[in-house]
From Swiss-Prot:
Catalytic reaction list: AMP + ATP = 2 ADP
Protein name: Adenylate kinase
Gene expressing this chain: adk
Biological process terms in GO annotation: AMP salvage
Swiss-Prot/TrEMBL keywords: ATP-binding, Cytoplasm, Kinase, Nucleotide biosynthesis, Nucleotide-binding, Transferase
HAMAP family named in the record: Adenylate_kinase_Adk (MF_00235)
Domain of life: Bacteria
Keyword tRNA-binding belongs to the record: no
Pfam families from the UniProt entry: ADK
Enzyme class per UniProt: transferase
Xref: PANTHER family: NUCLEOTIDE KINASE
One cellular component term from this protein's GO annotations in UniProt: cytoplasm
Enzyme Commission identifier(s): 2.7.4.3
Length: 189
């Protein structure tokens, strides 16, 4: 199976590029953001708990996310692979994901890091918030999310470099140009 972690700060284009990867490679997309938004919309207990963290710009506790992902991953047993979008966000999550996949005879194939400067991220996220009405795309929450990303999530780059799975992708440019760079990285696996 082709198991990809797509990585980058909020607003780096993970969702957009994930859709293109899914279409080209015929793999399934697991977006923790979409899963969590569905839980919140449906008013589940997990959704209510998650909403409290999201509204404060904080990360969801690992044990909640790993359980959700294991269930979703297991529903794709006959798949060519999956792309993990929005997970892992910390080294303990990466280690938990590795264990969860190993228990299923799988591993991460590659981690794609969509690298975008912070000023551009702010511009993209403020625009997205205005267009979509997403509550977590206001300036104050965006700044908190970027601080969390830089302190808690960014160390994953070194983790995946150590695993030999890291691929840097320049997240500036056209969607097509960025996707070409992604395909070059994936096609060499």
């Amino acid at each position: 199976m082709l198991n990809i972690v797509i990585f980058g700060a909020p607003g780096s284009g993970k969702g957009t590029q994930s859709e293109r990867i899914v279409e080209k490679y015929g793999i399934n997309h697991i977006s923790t953001g979409d899963v969590l938004r569905a839980e919140i919309k449906n008013g589940t207990e997990l959704g209510k708990t998650a909403k409290g963290y999201i509204d404060q710009g904080q990360l969801i506790p690992d044990e909640l996310m790993v359980d959700i992902l294991a269930s979703v991953f297991d529903s794709f047993k006959d798949s060519k692979g999956v792309i993990f979008d929005g997970f892992p966000r910390t080294i303990p999550q990466a280690e938990a994901l590795k264990v969860m996949l190993k228990e299923r005879g799988q591993d991460i194939s590659v981690m794609l890091d969509l690298d975008v400067p912070e000023e551009e991220l702010m511009t993209r996220l403020i625009k997205r918030g205005k267009e979509s009405g997403r509550a977590d795309d206001n300036e104050e929450t965006i700044k908190k999310r970027l601080v969390v990303y830089n302190t808690q999530t960014s160390p994953l780059k070194e983790y995946y470099k150590g695993e030999g799975k890291y691929q840097h992708i320049n997240g500036l440019g056209t969607m097509e140009g960025i996707f070409e760079d992604i395909c070059k990285a994936v096609d060499t696996l």
